[in-house]
């Protein structure tokens, strides 16, 4: 289901632990990492889609997490043509996403990447809050940065800014 501009409605999930580290999932049989995300089905609310995707990709149930907040508006990214299925070319532009910030209230052992028959991830780790911005595939970078910035500024008081994180990383790498 695409909107008039060719964007597929989608939810993204930023799952954090008690140290404000983020869940970072390794895609099955690939060397790429990303946050859990997935499409919103017709008639499904973004929150319902978020809980479905959380279970399908991470194996967590609503009782394992607490919703801290969500982005106010849709964040969009365009998918490069060489990544688009042939039958979608010409009509599909990319994804528009509502992002949720969740806190894990369960335990690490509650994560089950094989909760469904078609897992999305075959590995995962906790990662520094801002690190995914520099590690995600290029065409998703601005959306990741936008979601992380909005959600941290609204819901995670005292969180180091991305600019401070990037400056510290730069000085550490000298």
UniProtKB/Swiss-Prot annotation:
Alphabetical keyword list: Hydrolase
Record keyword DNA-binding present: no
EC number assigned by the record: 3.6.1.-
Intervals of motif Nudix box: 38-59
InterPro entries: Nudix_hydrolase, NUDIX_hydrolase-like_dom_sf, NUDIX_hydrolase_CS, NUDIX_hydrolase_dom, RppH
UniProt xrefs under PROSITE patterns: NUDIX (PS51462), NUDIX_BOX (PS00893)
Cited Pfam families: NUDIX
Statement: the UniProt record of this protein carries the keyword S-adenosyl-L-methionine: no
Obligatory cofactor(s): a divalent metal cation
Residue ranges occupied by any Nudix hydrolase domain in the UniProt entry: 6-149
Molecular function as annotated in GO: pyrophosphatase activity
Gene3D superfamilies xrefs: Nucleoside Triphosphate Pyrophosphohydrolase (3.90.79.10)
The protein's role, per its UniProt record: Accelerates the degradation of transcripts by removing pyrophosphate from the 5'-end of triphosphorylated RNA, leading to a more labile monophosphorylated state that can stimulate subsequent ribonuclease cleavage.
Similarity-based family: Belongs to the Nudix hydrolase family. RppH subfamily.
Protein name, as recorded: RNA pyrophosphohydrolase
Species in which this protein is naturally found: Neisseria meningitidis serogroup A / serotype 4A (strain DSM 15465 / Z2491)
């Amino acid at each position: 289901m695409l909107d008039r501009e060719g964007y597929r409605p989608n939810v993204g999930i930023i799952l954090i632990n008690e140290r404000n580290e983020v869940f970072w999932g390794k895609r099955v049989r690939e060397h790429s990492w990303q946050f859990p995300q997935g499409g919103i089905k017709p008639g499904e609310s973004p929150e319902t889609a978020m809980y479905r995707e959380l279970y399908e990709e991470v194996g967590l149930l609503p009782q394992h997490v607490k919703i801290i907040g969500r982005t106010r508006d849709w964040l969009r990214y365009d998918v490069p043509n060489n990544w688009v299925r042939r039958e979608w070319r010409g009509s599909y532009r990319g994804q528009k996403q509502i992002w949720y910030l969740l806190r894990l209230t369960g335990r690490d052992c509650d994560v089950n990447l094989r909760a469904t028959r078609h897992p999305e991830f075959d590995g995962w780790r906790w990662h520094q809050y801002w690190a995914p911005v520099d590690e995600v595939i290029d065409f998703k970078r601005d959306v990741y940065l936008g979601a992380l910035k909005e959600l941290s500024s609204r819901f995670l008081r005292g969180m180091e800014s991305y600019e401070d994180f990037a400056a510290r990383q730069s000085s550490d790498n000298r």
